Amino acid sequence: MRNTFTRCLEDYARAHEELVLVTGDLGFGVLFPYMKEFPDRFFNAGISEQAMMSMAAGLALEGHTVVVYSIGNFPTLRCLEQIRNCCAYHDANVKIVCVGAGFVYGVLGMTHHATEDMSALRLLPGVKVYAPADAAETEAVMGPFLSEPGVAYLRIGRGGEACLHDAQALKGYESGKAVPYADGTDAY
């Protein structure tokens, strides 16, 4: 999922000069190709997530599409007030990406768990939440995630997730619509 995200991000950035990427001092292995190709559109905010989100809002209000990238709960719960006050209330074009949703970074302790992130962001006005199940769904949601105006949140796995969908079956994905895994009547 993470590699699919970065590939789609790079493709989008080539066609949209307004796109910038902000990270919280991590992800360099997977983000290196973006950093190399777009050095003027990459910012490392350091380990200061709240300032990172405020910076993203400022860039967005100046006309940029800003992607904020971090792990676990750091781009969400750590800076929920900044997302609410600086991004959501101003309908800033900020795209928040969490890598390692749920307990993926569990061995690092509960400070790295991202279990309440989706429900917290769903409470904020106008925030769209995307939670793809696999790389195929990640690719399908990247277009709407990046191109639709306003605040959006993308929650993806760290890598190695099983592929549940055929990418062709997801062509024409529409934001806000469910993607069925299978049809059947066994449940009723």
Model-derived segments and their meaning:
Residues 1-178:
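Thiamine diphosphate
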Residues 181-188:
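Short, intrinsically disordered, charge-balanced linker/junction segments flanking boundaries
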